[in-house]
Amino acid sequence: MYSISFQEESLLPRERLVRLGAEQLSNQELLSILIRTGNKKENVFQIASKILSSVSSLTELRHMTLSELQGMSGIGQVKAIELQAMIELGSRISKAENFEGERILSSQKLAKKMQQELSHKKQEHLVALYLNTQNQIIHQQTIFIGSLTRSLAEPREILHYAIKHMATSIILVHNHPSGATRPSRDDDQVTEKIKEACEMMGFVLLDHLIVGGDSYYSYREETDLI
């Protein structure tokens, strides 16, 4: 007589998490929990190990596209979607911890933070930061992703979040994937259009930053538009 015992592949890391806490688990163990199961060729620990060995750092994993995740051994479409959702949620939590409640003292300091967030993006991202009367960030919102043109950057959505979060002022930030930070004519027109809309609604447009690579451009510092 013999018996066959079956233990779910990722059960041990789950037990360790319950017993010791998530902070005590290795990156491989945490990733194994998220992946959940292996396949016919590899168990979940081997898949997690391969994924981690294919990137130079966890930051690189955060920047991977859905198709790049799905192209990894043992990762199908569903797991790739789940991983990207988890990565994005973690990124948003980190941004909330780093920004919300922080007082903005200079365009340079803010630009350095936004460079870390946006400089690696392959498309333009327009982000609005909403501040209270103490110049503390109370909300951050990605307005849209794509080329920044006057027709796309409608003030309506930007002001919607200002009203929703009871902000008193707004800072716009967008990236140039090329790395060049000099504003285009479209950038100037968008800035002027949104400034006028803010003034009509009683909000202050404090700045519009353009970030790319290791440099930035501040409309407040460089022009009289703001």
From Swiss-Prot:
Q: Which Pfam families match?
A: RadC (PF04002), UPF0758_N (PF20582)
Q: Which GO terms describe its molecular function?
A: metal ion binding; metallopeptidase activity
Its keywords, alphabetically, are:
Hydrolase, Metal-binding, Metalloprotease, Protease, Zinc
Q: Where is this motif: JAMM motif?
A: 174-187
GO terms under biological process: proteolysis
Task: Cite the MPN domain residue spans from the record.
Answer: 103-225
Sequence positions that bind Zn(2+): 174, 176, 187
The record ties this protein, via Gene3D superfamilies, to: Cytidine Deaminase, domain 2
Protein family: Belongs to the UPF0758 family.
Question: Entry's NCBIfam families?
Answer: PRK00024.1, radc
Name used for this protein in its record: UPF0758 protein SGO_1229
